[in-house]
Design a protein with these regions (language model features):
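Short, solvent-exposed beta-strand edge segments and adjacent coil->beta transition regions
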Residues: 34, 107, 132-134, 153, ...
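Short, charge-rich amphipathic segments
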Residues: 43, 142-156, 240-241, 245, ...
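Glycine-rich hexapeptide-repeat left-handed beta-helix
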Residues: 190-192, 196-332
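Short loop/turn microsegments at loop-to-beta-strand junctions
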Residues: 141-142, 160, 209, 259
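Ordered hydrophobic segments in well-structured contexts
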Residues: 125, 146, 154, 263, ...
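Terminal amphipathic alpha-helical/low-complexity segments used for targeting or macromolecular assembly
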Residues: 1-129, 285, 291, 300-332
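Extracellular beta-strand solenoid repeats
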Residues: 125, 131-133, 138, 145, ...
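Short, mixed-charge, low-aromatic patches
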Residues: 3-9, 123-126, 143, 173-176, ...
Length: 332
């Protein structure tokens, strides 16, 4: 392997190795995704992670502007009628914010925390049939879009900027720390920051996901966690941390930033209590057994991963045939 380190951000899209391209992990033709543009406007999957904030902020401005004329708008207050019907007091509110509700939406948060700056106001748009009950809404740093028929349960903490699609369930205990794009039909409970989860992604248990991408129908088992910063890098002051380096096809690539979690291709799964190192790439249909520690690098597609018992640092890798499991499922 050459000693030269290539800066990923300096490469044109056509010069990016296949293992770092979006099409290696996500089949948007088979599984269309509303925010596919995030990947089209960046040169690599890691470039997409870096672009989440900017993309989400711009998309929110555009879509909320389009929806404004058809929604009921409340500035620095929450609509009173739902709280009155329940016999409860109004939500606690602080600062400047804006609520846009479509007919049939229910907005009964516990707290709404807006900007303390007089010249700054972010918005939350709640589509028809969506329900937000007992959640803590933080609009200090960005706006929010909550898609139709999505439910956000009591006890959820959610910070903007964030986009949540249609028919998604955000369960009690979830902590969404901002810069999140979550697709349609997802189930969410753990802690998420700066990540994109595509349609039908399942993150339904106490877990952590940061600086990551999760494709169509990916799944996290209970307590599965993605480390996004090396354990020794955590001992270094943030300004002095070095960028993460990934080895790919005999070359070393400087990602430009010290943090990255996991890139999970369509249908990939992490078993219960599995941990991935910063900079782990799982191609489609890659499945990790429970209690595995997955070192950074590239795995799959169509592969099963597990740690070898009683041996240090060994990952067993076996072929996986998706068509077999699908046929088996059809017979049950």
């Amino acid at each position: 392997m050459t000693n030269d380190v290539i800066k990923l951000t300096d490469l044109n899209k056509e010069d990016i190795p296949a293992d770092l391209r979006a099409e290696t992990y996500f089949d948007f033709k088979a599984h269309p995704f509303e925010h596919q543009e995030l990947f089209e406007q960046t040169n690599s999957v890691y470039g997409a992670i870096l672009a989440i904030h900017e993309y989400a902020a711009k998309w929110l401005v555009d879509i909320i502007g389009q929806k404004r004329s058809s929604a009921r708008v409340f500035k620095n207050k929450t609509p009173p009628r739902f709280a009155a019907q329940a016999g409860a007091g109004a939500a606690h509110t602080i600062g400047n914010f804006e609520v846009l509700l479509q007919d049939g939406a229910i907005f009964e948060p516990a707290w709404v925390i807006g900007s303390l700056k007089d010249n700054l106001r972010h918005s939350i748009y709640v589509a028809e049939g969506a329900k937000i009950i007992g959640a803590n809404i933080y609009l200090e740093n960005g706006s929010m879009y909550i898609g139709s028929q999505t439910t956000i349960e009591p006890g959820v903490g959610i910070k903007g900027p964030i986009i949540i699609g249609k028919g998604t369930e955000v369960r009690q205990g979830a902590y969404l720390r901002g810069d999140c794009i979550i697709g349609d039909g997802c189930t969410i409970r753990g802690e998420i920051k700066n990540s994109c989860l595509m349609n039908k992604a399942n993150f339904p248990h106490p877990s952590y996901l940061g600086d990551s991408l999760c494709g169509y129908m990916t799944h996290f088992g209970n307590q599965a966690t993605t480390a996004n910063l090396g354990i020794f890098a955590g001992l270094v002051e943030p300004a002095k941390r070095k960028a993460l380096i990934i080895k790919c096809n005999g070359k070393a690539y400087d990602l430009g930033k010290p943090k990255m979690g996991v890139c999970m291709g369509d249908y990939s799964q992490l078993g219960c209590n599995c941990v991935t190192d910063p900079g782990t790439f799982l191609k489609p249909y890659t499945i990790s057994y429970a209690l595995a520690r997955i070192s950074k690098g590239f795995y799959g597609p169509n592969e099963i991963l597990k740690n070898k018992p009683l041996e240090h640092g060994i990952i067993e890798r076996s072929p996986y045939k998706p068509e077999f499991s699908q046929k088996t499922e059809d017979r049950i």
